[in-house]
Swiss-Prot record:
It holds the Pfam family LplA-B_cat. The gene is lipM. Residues 33-248 form the BPL/LPL catalytic domain. This is Octanoyltransferase LipM. The active site is at C150. It comes from Bacillus anthracis. Catalyzes the transfer of endogenously produced octanoic acid from octanoyl-acyl-carrier-protein onto the lipoyl domain of GcvH, an intermediate carrier during protein lipoylation. PROSITE patterns: BPL_LPL_CATALYTIC. GO terms for molecular function: lipoyl(octanoyl) transferase activity. Monomer. Keywords: Acyltransferase, Transferase.
Amino acid sequence: MGKEKWCYINSGQCSPAFNMALDECLLNWQSEKKMPPTIRFYEWEVPTLTVGYFQRVEKDINMDVVNEKKYGFVRRQTGGRGVLHDKELTYSVIVSEDHPNMPKTVTEAYRVISQGLLDGFKALGLEAYYAVPKTEADRENLKNPRSGVCFDAPSWYEIVVEGRKIAGSAQTRQKGVILQHGSIPLEIDLDELYDLFLFPNERVKERMKSMFASKAVAINELTDRTFTIEQLIKAFEVGFEKGLDVELVPYELTEEQLHEVQTLAKEKYESKEWNYKK
């Protein structure tokens, strides 16, 4: 028996709405048994702030700055907090909940899927490992994030290097399908990032920023080498094949599929109703 074959899609740079619409369509097609499990890598046409499904824009986000910088803005269908996508590789994994290798609990499925990330970081020569909250207090902290910024604390089975979080991921389960997507940052500009969020005052903002710097890290901060997106793609292709014990088979969307994605992008992910709904 050979390895199970999964689809592999490298979308390159796309618009914020297209990126979110394709992830949703892949979830739908998986649910309808039209496609095998899929690994997707993608980038962003412009630096883009994504917010979690439950996040309240007016409470957390400084939209004046987002608009002033001409950044993209879109709401994800996954939970979690705000992420600035810039100078990063973004990934998504779409697989049926009843896949024989997928555990039933969210955290354990997260661990299985994230093994691909772990092996990808190792392929880059980084000593990555899972963060598991050790104490009851640490576990409680996961339920009460300190700010609207995603990377400010490692959660269950988040991947860390030298004690700092290196990949931010979120998961949703709909229609019997798991969608997990997340960021693999080459660089993080803290000033750019924190200008996009609302804080009670400047002092709180600076405190959060310094806490973030002690808890999160990007790949190029960790090594004398400067990696490119192309090198990341190669490393994480290897990582997911090894971590999930599958063979990735390149896949191109059909014209019909592309049209479905573009329609969903326009009708949902470009709409104010969706993006500002909370």
